[in-house]
UniProtKB/Swiss-Prot annotation:
The keyword Nucleus applies. Involved in pre-mRNA splicing and spliceosome disassembly. Promotes release of excised lariat intron from the spliceosome by acting as a receptor for PRP43. This targeting of PRP43 leads to disassembly of the spliceosome with the separation of the U2, U5, U6 snRNPs and the NTC complex. Residues 61-108 form the G-patch domain. GO terms for cellular component: chromosome, telomeric region; cytoplasm; mitochondrion; nucleolus; nucleus; U2-type post-mRNA release spliceosomal complex. The keyword Metal-binding does not apply. It is found in: Cytoplasm; Nucleus. Pfam families: G-patch. Keywords: Cytoplasm, mRNA processing, mRNA splicing, Nucleus, Spliceosome. One of its GO terms (molecular function) is nucleic acid binding. This is Pre-mRNA-splicing factor SPP382. The lineage of its organism: Eukaryota, Fungi, Dikarya, Ascomycota, Saccharomycotina. It comes from Saccharomyces cerevisiae (strain ATCC 204508 / S288c) (Baker's yeast). Present with 556 molecules/cell in log phase SD medium. GO terms for biological process: generation of catalytic spliceosome for first transesterification step; negative regulation of double-strand break repair via nonhomologous end joining; spliceosomal complex disassembly. InterPro entries: G_patch_dom, TFP11/STIP/Ntr1.
């Protein structure tokens, strides 16, 4: 029998441990059970069989709260306050769907799994607590949370309705409130009438609140309409004024004060259709056009208000289009790449740039009339001037500010391809020499790095192989130096090489040409050195005659440059050493290697590492590191002054004291801003602009407010 009891206790303990959400230890449960049995000996809790339940069953139903109440001396049917007062209704708890999940979709979606997994334990709990009555807290005379005792649901309805009315701002007469005080003394029929009236009043108040919420925006709109009506009245007076005191710009400015975009569009288009009459003479485009200037200002004003990104034109844009485009179309249909037409086209595009962009015609004109002519002219250009064609160097750079990036890249690629083909197919006896102006144009257009890369890869090796190696030998000129021949008629030899070298000077980098001249005169100096070393005294003067003849022939048609003069002086220095009977090799470089020198020069100075430059990222406003941004507030102020035409300069040894910083005492240098005869002194500190007023005090202002 004892064994069976012990087994029963073990089974009961196992169930208790499985459903005990607080996981209390066995010792706590046993101690609490002993104390609770003593406390609940005389309480009113009874089971269905009439016996007092054990404390373990009580804790299974109410958890730790029952333990705490028993420890505090709780007796069933009485409160815990003085004289048995206290709360009469226990706080009802709600179990969560999952013991380890919080709020949200996860706990809801998994609650069924939790219930299914613990179904056995929950059913066991129901079996344990089945038949136990709820704990009842009998309230005495103490009020709950300070409220009066309410007998039925009607009293609660009255109290709640009065509270809602008070929160809604409805003040009931004092006489009605006195009739309801105390509420227990009011007869039930009267209570029913009061409830009905109060609820009806509350419904009316809610309806009024809804109406107020709907009418509040309408009141704002009504005020706006009154303001628009006043503006329309003023606008009518302005538009009816046919005198010249009110300009078209002022009239459109008055229209833009309205808030209705559709009305603005209609009025503006109607006004422009009536008053915009623009004429221009293609033969006198340089003359100022006041109407065009006013139209440009009007478009700048309209661009802030109208959406010009849409592919469909509004009424205002359509009106301007009908006035402007037909007149411009006549010119563009007859456009060709002659000098006069090119100048007129650039002038028209610059003058009408904002107008054409506003009406969406700029890209159409460029793609339909301008771009095809430009690209065709580039295809026909052979890198030299022709009678029937205008060189691209005259018009390409001017058009660069007007064309888009895609066409810019196309033009650059075409010029680069032509120069590459020229260098690749170059031959010294057949190929023409590109003029210096065209070489400068090509460098500027495709950039010097790409220019020298093509030159050193394609042109320079051919130049060295065909001219330097085969014709650069002054010793051949010793045989007939006395004969007066025209060297320009010869197609070989040293003079032919010098003629070609000097004609292609502008092709090379200055350092490259300097190396070539050094190598050329180094060969001449070797001959002079041997002449002075092995010849007789009588023949020494002949070497000077030979050098004079050589220089006079080479530089017959053009004076030598500074680089060439430097090498000429080194050669004549040999004669000075000969007169002193001391001849050294200071003017000679026996180890000189032109190809190696040019190769070193290309790697270090002339040609940068193109692959390294291509690896550098392209920075934009979005990805540029802050470490590479060096702009300061002083730079911003200087840029602003530059745009306004002001001159800003620092005043030497002049400082002022500003009420700025923690101690309100900051010493900063002074700057002077001038605009003609007007000037003012300013100070800069921590992105704040301080301007001196008439009293000599410096006060902070916004940069846009700086005006002279």
């Amino acid at each position: 029998m004892e064994d069976s009891d012990s087994n029963t206790d073990k089974k009961f303990f196992f169930k208790k441990r499985r459903i005990d959400s607080y996981n209390y230890s066995d010792e706590e449960d046993n101690n609490s059970s002993m104390n609770s049995d003593m406390t609940y000996t005389n309480d009113a809790l009874k089971t269905s069989s009439g016996n007092a339940p054990t404390i373990s069953k009580l804790t299974k139903t109410y958890g730790i709260g029952a333990k705490l109440l028993s420890s505090m001396g709780y007796v069933a049917g009485k409160g815990l306050g003085k004289d048995g007062s206290g709360i009469t209704t226990p706080i009802e708890t709600q179990s969560r769907p999952m013991h380890n999940a919080g709020l949200g979709m996860f706990s809801n979606t998994n609650s069924s799994n939790y219930h299914s997994e613990n179904e056995d334990y929950l059913s066991s709990e129901d079996e344990v607590v089945e038949g136990i009555e709820q704990v009842k807290f009998n309230k005495t005379s103490t009020e709950v949370l300070g409220e009066a005792l309410l007998n039925d649901s009607g009293d609660m309805t009255i109290v709640r309705t009065l509270r809602e009315l008070r929160l809604a701002g409805v003040q009931l007469p004092e006489s009605i409130l006195k009739e309801l005080d105390p509420l227990n003394a009011v007869p039930k029929p009267k209570k029913d009438v009061v409830v009905e009236i109060l609820q009806e009043l509350l419904g009316i108040e809610k309806s009024l609140e809804a109406i107020r919420q709907r009418t509040s925006p309408l009141e704002v709109q009504v005020k706006e309409y009154y303001g628009q009506e006043r503006l329309l009245s003023e606008l009518e007076v302005t538009l009816r004024d046919e005198s010249k005191h009110v300009s078209l710009y002022d009239k459109i400015g008055a229209i833009l004060k309205l808030s209705d975009d559709e009305l603005i569009d209609r009025l503006t288009s109607c006004l422009l259709r009536k008053e915009l009459l623009i004429e221009f003479d293609l033969d006198h485009l340089e003359k100022p056009n006041d109407i065009l200037d006013e139209l440009t200002q009007i478009i700048e004003l309209l661009a802030y208000r109208m959406d010009t990104t849409s592919k469909f034109l509004n009424r205002t844009q359509t009106t301007i289009f009908k006035v402007i485009y037909p007149k411009l179309k006549k010119f563009w249909e007859g456009f060709d790449m002659t000098k006069s037409k090119i100048d007129s086209a650039i002038t028209l595009l610059l003058d009408f740039q904002q107008v054409l962009s506003f009406i969406g015609c700029k890209e159409h004109i460029m793609e339909e009339f301008v771009y095809p002519k430009l690209l065709q002219e580039l295809d026909n250009w052979e890198l030299h001037d022709e009678v029937d064609h205008v060189s691209p160097r005259i018009w390409v750079l001017d058009f660069m500010v007007l064309i888009d990036d895609k066409i810019k890249d196309t033009i650059v690629d075409k010029i680069e391809a032509k120069f590459f083909a020229y260098c690749k197919n170059w031959y010294h006896r057949e190929s023409f020499c590109i003029t210096n102006s065209d070489i400068i144009f090509i460098k500027e257009l495709i950039c010097e790095r790409r220019y020298y890369k093509i030159l050193c890869k394609e042109f320079l090796p051919k130049f060295l192989d065909e001219l330097w190696e085969r014709h650069n030998d002054p010793i051949y000129e010793l045989e007939d130096w006395k004969e007066k021949q025209e060297w320009k008629e010869k197609d070989s030899g040293f003079f032919y090489f010098m003629k070609k070298l000097r004609s292609y000077t502008h092709y090379f980098h200055p350092k490259q040409y300097e190396l070539m001249m050094r190598g050329t005169f180094n060969n001449i100096n070797k001959i002079l050195y041997q002449w002075h070393l092995y010849s007789t005294v009588e023949d020494l003067h002949k070497s000077k005659w030979w050098l004079n003849w050589l220089m006079n022939t080479v530089f017959e048609h053009s004076l030598p440059t500074e680089i060439e003069l430097s090498e000429i002086r080194k050669s004549y220095n040999i004669f000075a050493m000969s007169h002193r009977y001391h001849l050294d090799k200071s003017t000679l470089d026996e180890d000189f290697d032109l190809r190696q020198g040019l190769r070193n020069l290309m790697e270090t100075q002339v040609i940068d590492d193109i692959s390294q430059s291509e690896q550098e990222p392209t920075y934009t406003v979005q990805n540029i590191p802050l470490g590479k941004v060096s702009s300061s507030f002083k730079d911003v102020v200087e840029d602003y002054c530059l745009e306004k035409g002001y001159l800003i300069s620092k005043i030497p040894n002049r400082y002022t004291q500003l009420p700025y910083g923690r101690d309100q005492d900051c010493i900063v240098p002074l700057f002077e801003i001038r605009n003609g005869k007007k000037k003012m002194e300013v100070a800069l500190k921590h992105d704040i602009l301080w301007v001196e007023d008439s009293s000599g005090t410096f006060k902070p202002i916004y940069l846009w407010a700086l005006d002279l």
